[in-house]
């Protein structure tokens, strides 16, 4: 694993521990106890904040986007740990898609039930 990705590996180790032990007073425990709905709410919130930050000008906007990307990745990893998904599994999925057009990959997926939204 590249050294730059080691913090993600360490974070995932911590999140797996939190998922197993659910220590009192932990923010991560609170999210995990709320399940997919609570974690998903935070992911949506952080995604919106990242989008807003990405539109901010100059280096300050770039730094804000980096900060918000960290929040989004953290919360996505909380969901992964809650669901028992490992970073290696996500990496393998991304490797599987490598070299495949996004449109081709999307077309190969099974059809989803209509969620009532356009362009899901």
Curated annotation (Swiss-Prot):
<feature type="region of interest" description="Disordered">
    <location>
        <begin position="97"/>
        <end position="120"/>
    </location>
</feature>
<dbReference type="GO" id="GO:0005524">
    <property type="term" value="F:ATP binding"/>
</dbReference>
<protein>
    <recommendedName>
        <fullName>Phosphoribosyl-ATP pyrophosphatase</fullName>
        <ecNumber>3.6.1.31</ecNumber>
    </recommendedName>
</protein>
<comment type="similarity">
    <text>Belongs to the PRA-PH family.</text>
</comment>
<feature type="compositionally biased region" description="Basic and acidic residues">
    <location>
        <begin position="106"/>
        <end position="120"/>
    </location>
</feature>
<keyword id="KW-0378">Hydrolase</keyword>
<dbReference type="Pfam" id="PF01503">
    <property type="entry name" value="PRA-PH"/>
</dbReference>
<keyword id="KW-0067">ATP-binding</keyword>
<keyword id="KW-0547">Nucleotide-binding</keyword>
<keyword id="KW-0368">Histidine biosynthesis</keyword>
<dbReference type="InterPro" id="IPR021130">
    <property type="entry name" value="PRib-ATP_PPHydrolase-like"/>
</dbReference>
<dbReference type="InterPro" id="IPR008179">
    <property type="entry name" value="HisE"/>
</dbReference>
<dbReference type="GO" id="GO:0000105">
    <property type="term" value="P:L-histidine biosynthetic process"/>
</dbReference>
<keyword id="KW-0963">Cytoplasm</keyword>
<dbReference type="GO" id="GO:0004636">
    <property type="term" value="F:phosphoribosyl-ATP diphosphatase activity"/>
</dbReference>
<comment type="pathway">
    <text>Amino-acid biosynthesis; L-histidine biosynthesis; L-histidine from 5-phospho-alpha-D-ribose 1-diphosphate: step 2/9.</text>
</comment>
<dbReference type="GO" id="GO:0005737">
    <property type="term" value="C:cytoplasm"/>
</dbReference>
<keyword id="KW-0028">Amino-acid biosynthesis</keyword>
């Amino acid at each position: 694993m590249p050294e730059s990705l080691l913090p993600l590996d360490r974070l995932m180790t911590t999140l797996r521990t939190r998922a197993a032990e659910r220590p009192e007073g932990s923010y991560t425990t609170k999210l995990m106890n709320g399940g997919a709905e609570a974690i998903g709410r935070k992911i949506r919130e952080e995604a919106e904040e990242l989008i807003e930050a990405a539109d901010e000008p100059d280096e300050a906007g770039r730094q804000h986007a980096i900060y918000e990307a960290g929040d989004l990745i953290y919360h996505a990893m909380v969901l992964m740990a809650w669901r028992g998904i490992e970073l290696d599994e996500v990496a393998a999925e991304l490797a599987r898609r490598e070299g495949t057009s996004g449109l081709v990959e999307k077309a190969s997926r099974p059809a989803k039930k209509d969620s009532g939204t356009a362009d899901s």
